[in-house]
Each structure stands twice: as structure tokens, then as C-alpha cells.
């Protein structure tokens, strides 16, 4: 059953007053309140449905015009929202050392392809490629206080540069494979030539990777003066470039570590069950090859949030990242099944401290 929006919800009327001066007239302000009300009370939160349920709107395109054309600044509204949230939670937030910025990404799936920048993005949870907008997001967490900060829209390189179009222009006989590895090979073969085309080169310069977007979100949080010291992130954000940005801003970080990442062999020593050093060949060892070498006796039971984990931790060096501490964690004493690998720049933290911090990242799943 659809609920008609006759007037703004009471909580919206009360809180929206903070934003009143950001809108040029009463109509813009009313659209703002109606849109927020629709997001709260309607199950279907699409713009079309909110417009349909707003009874006092003579023209159902008014709300669309308000969001896309009206002369108000989304950035000013965003900044005011964050300032207001921080001011309202001063007594509830913890110290900066116990506060976090969480980086994540999300797929906003769509049925049709009429939306601007909608594209097929990889969904790692079910190995599919749905039509969606792919957002890189930032969230603030400090004790009981948690709320989203901002987002950046990720656009695939091929979509930004109109890559297929330029391949056909310069290599009309070239077939473009669907498989990722084969497609990557075509990129290596053709992109240097495509970049000689001034139009393609201009589009290439406009592309922003997820790392670029994550850096932007971190910088925005620092410019806003958010009180925090630690960044929590997923494995695909862990790069030399992002780590260097965090080092410059003197921020700590904890991340998942992909199992195919290399460890520098000379940076650690692993011993067998008898305490004898295990000789390792080569200069690098993948995490997935390192884990089977760890004796069961080296794992320690660690309790976090009333859940037991069996953890091994040591300091290693990762190419491009430097010296870090890693934690290999199983959820059972038999060390069977899947495991997680965490990594942090804080080599002085214990396995419990690292686990406890990273597990806070899951709080955003309920936002």
C-alpha cells in the first residue's frame, strides 16, 4: 500500500529548519522536505514514486526539476548536514583515537539503462555484472555515533573514455572479447595507439580509479575536521598510493589483505613445530602460500565481542607498502575452512586490537 505524502513528516519539519537558508524560496524548501519524507516513509524510494505520492504537487516533474535544475548547492547541504550531525553528537562521540573513517563501495542496481552513467559493474558477492551505479563511500564511526559522510561515483575506464568507440574508429577489424583477461590483453595492445588521438587522451585524463576516489573522500574528511585517527578499508583500496596519502596525513589504517599479495621473504622468519627455521626460496611469497607453513601451535585463541578467533600475527614487509603487521584469523580451533588476513601500519598493535578495530567496519552494513 502506498502512503500519500500530505505534508512533511514531523521529524523532517523539525530538523529541516537547519537547512532553510540554503534554499532560495519556499517551494524549494518544500520539495526538500517532501523528498526527505519520501525517503523515510515509502518502501519504494525512487524519485518517480516519491513524486507520485506527493499529493500537493501539481506537476509531478517539480521534484525532478528541484533535484536536477534548481539553483541550490548539494555540496552546501552536505556540509551543513555533517556540521549538524557532529554538533548534535558532541557528548556521545568518543576520542579521536577511538573514532574511524570507513571506506566502502556499493552497487545501486537499476532495472533500466536510462540513468546517466549507469553501467554493468562486477558484484563480487555473487559473481554477476548487474546494471548499477557504483559508489565509493565514506562513513564516520565513533562509539554509538555512526553516519555516512560522502560518496563518489565510480565510472569504468571503458565507459569514461568510450573505449569501444575509439577501438572501432582506429581498428575497425578488431574484435572486442567479453572475457576480462582477453579484454585486458587488447588494452595492452591498443591503448598506446589510442592515446595518440587527442580526444581519447582528454577522456583518459578524466578517468578516476577507485583509489583516486577513496583518496578524495579521505581528503574531504580531513578538510571537514572530522575527529578520527584510523581508516578501515577493504582489500582493493590497499595500494602504495593510498597508503602514502594516509602517511602524509598521519592516519593509521587497517585493511583486509588479498591472499595473492606478496610478502618479502627476507622480512620475516617462520619456524616449524620443532622450532627450526623453515628455509624459503625466492624473494617473495604469496600470503596463500605462507599460511600453510604456519604451525598450528603458533595460533592463539583471541576473544573479540564475545566471539572466539584463532590468530597468528607477525610483522612483514609488503612490496610498495613497507613494514606492516598482519593477522591471520580462523573462526575455529581446527584452523579449517576459510580464513581472513588483516594488515595494518600499526606494528605495535596486538591481534586482538587489530581484529577489534576492523570488525567495527561491519557496523555500516546496518546503515
Predicted regions, residues:
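Active-site-proximal, Lys/Arg-enriched surface segment
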Residues: 36, 67-173, 308, 313
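Short, contiguous clusters of charged residues that form electrostatic/catalytic patches at enzyme active sites
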Residues: 34, 133-136, 212-219
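Gly/serine-rich nucleotide phosphate-binding loop at the start of the catalytic core
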Residues: 1-70, 74-76
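Hydrophobic, Leu/Ile/Phe/Ala-enriched alpha-helical segments that form helix-helix packing faces
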Residues: 39-40, 54, 89, 218-225
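A residue-level signal for conserved active-site and pocket-lining positions in enzyme catalytic cores
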Residues: 50, 138, 342
Amino acid at each position: 500500500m502506498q502512503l500519500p505524502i500530505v505534508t512533511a513528516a514531523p521529524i523532517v519539519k523539525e530538523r529541516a529548519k537547519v537547512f532553510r537558508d540554503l534554499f532560495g524560496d519556499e517551494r524549494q524548501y518544500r520539495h526538500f522536505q517532501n523528498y526527505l519524507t519520501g525517503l523515510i516513509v515509502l518502501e519504494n524510494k525512487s524519485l518517480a514514486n516519491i513524486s507520485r505520492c506527493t499529493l500537493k504537487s501539481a506537476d509531478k516533474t517539480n521534484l525532478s526539476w528541484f533535484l536536477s535544475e534548481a539553483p541550490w548547492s548539494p555540496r552546501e547541504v552536505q556540509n551543513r548536514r555533517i556540521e549538524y550531525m557532529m554538533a548534535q553528537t558532541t557528548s556521545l562521540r568518543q576520542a579521536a583515537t577511538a573514532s574511524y573513517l570507513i571506506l566502502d563501495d556499493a552497487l545501486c542496481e537499476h532495472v533500466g539503462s536510462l540513468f546517466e552513467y549507469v553501467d554493468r559493474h562486477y558484484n563480487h558477492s555473487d559473481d554477476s555484472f548487474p546494471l548499477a551505479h557504483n559508489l565509493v563511500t565514506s562513513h564516520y564511526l565513533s562509539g554509538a555515533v555512526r553516519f555516512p559522510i560522502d560518496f563518489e561515483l565510480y565510472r569504468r575506464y571503458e565507459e569514461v573514455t568510450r573505449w569501444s568507440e575509439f577501438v572501432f574508429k582506429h581498428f575497425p577489424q578488431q574484435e572486442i572479447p567479453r572475457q576480462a583477461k582477453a579484454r585486458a590483453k587488447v588494452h595492452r595492445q591498443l591503448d598506446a595507439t589510442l592515446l595518440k588521438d587527442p580526444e581519447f587522451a582528454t577522456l583518459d585524463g578524466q578517468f578516476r580509479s577507485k583509489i583516486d576516489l577513496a583518496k578524495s573522500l579521505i581528503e574531504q574528511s580531513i578538510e571537514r575536521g572530522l575527529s578520527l585517527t584510523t581508516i578501515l578499508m577493504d582489500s582493493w583500496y590497499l595500494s602504495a598510493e593510498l597508503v602514502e596519502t594516509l602517511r602524509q596525513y598521519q592516519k593509521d589504517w587497517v585493511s583486509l589483505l588479498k591472499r595473492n599479495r606478496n610478502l618479502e621473504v627476507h622480512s620475516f622468519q617462520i619456524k616449524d613445530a620443532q622450532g627450526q627455521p623453515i628455509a624459503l626460496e625466492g624473494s617473495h611469497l604469496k600470503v596463500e602460500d605462507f599460511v600453510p607453513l604456519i604451525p598450528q601451535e603458533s595460533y592463539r585463541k583471541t576473544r573479540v565481542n564475545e566471539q572466539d578467533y584463532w590468530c597468528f600475527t607477525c610483522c612483514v614487509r609488503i612490496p610498495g607498502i613497507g613494514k606492516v603487521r598482519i593477522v591471520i584469523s580462523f573462526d575455529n580451533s581446527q584452523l579449517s575452512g576459510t580464513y581472513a588476513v588483516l594488515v595494518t601500519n600499526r606494528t605495535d598493535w596486538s591481534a586482538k586490537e587489530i581484529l577489534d578495530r576492523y570488525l567495527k567496519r561491519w557496523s555500516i552494513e546496518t546503515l
